Amino acid sequence: MATTISAVILAGGQAKRMAGLDKGLQLLQGKPLYQHCLQRLTNQVSSISINANRHQAIYQQSGVEVFGDELEDFQGPLSGILTALERANTDFVLFVPCDSPFLPLNLCEKLQSAVENSKSLLAYANDGEREHPAFSLLSTQLKLPLRVYLQSGHRQMLQFFRQHKAISVDFSLQKQAFVNMNTLQDIEKYQNIYA
């Protein structure tokens, strides 16, 4: 039976490095950052939703399902990941951050191949120099261990990933795909660069 995969754009953070502005809604080349992600995911998975804790009505204008973290107080990306895994009706969920408008068009394909070949429950991207755990594919079987991990007060993604024998997948030929917009200056820098 074929593995089923849905995708979630993680837009639930506080954006402290962007003066609290909602990162996913900042414009790059006339389009909100999250819409760049949505466009690049469309041909990779059958269904996409957005994890957002603010401005949900604006995100809903895109026509996709929007949901907030079940856990309160902005507990980091793992909180959004947990909520997504608990809501999912697919075998795996692909996660991407909302501030990465150039994400790889073959992200799902490569991560899926890695989990299938290794029989792992989890894979994430690296660019040959840095690990990028926010670009990850997780089995919904991890929802209970993740809930326990968060209830224990832990928040580090890579620590959880390593505990569950995550596969780090090499995207070193696509380094630029992992550029993210952490500040308004980052967005300004890339206004005239096209993916």
Swiss-Prot record:
The subunit structure is: Monomer.
Keyword Transferase attached: yes
The UniProt function text for this chain reads:
Transfers a GMP moiety from GTP to Mo-molybdopterin (Mo-MPT) cofactor (Moco or molybdenum cofactor) to form Mo-molybdopterin guanine dinucleotide (Mo-MGD) cofactor.
Q: Where in the cell is it found?
A: Cytoplasm
**Might you give the EC number(s) for this enzyme?**
2.7.7.77
Query: What name goes with this protein?
Result: Molybdenum cofactor guanylyltransferase
Q: Where does Mg(2+) bind?
A: 99
Q: Which SUPFAM superfamilies match?
A: Nucleotide-diphospho-sugar transferases
What start-end ranges are recorded for coiled-coil regions in this protein? none
User: Which GO BP terms sit in this record?
Assistant: bis(molybdopterin guanine dinucleotide)molybdenum biosynthetic process
Names of required cofactors = Mg(2+)
Domain comment as written in the entry: The N-terminal domain determines nucleotide recognition and specific binding, while the C-terminal domain determines the specific binding to the target protein.
Task: Using the UniProt record, name the top-level EC class of this enzyme in a single word.
Answer: transferase
Q: Which reaction does it catalyse?
A: Mo-molybdopterin + GTP + H(+) = Mo-molybdopterin guanine dinucleotide + diphosphate
Q: Which GO terms describe its molecular function?
A: GTP binding; metal ion binding; molybdenum cofactor guanylyltransferase activity
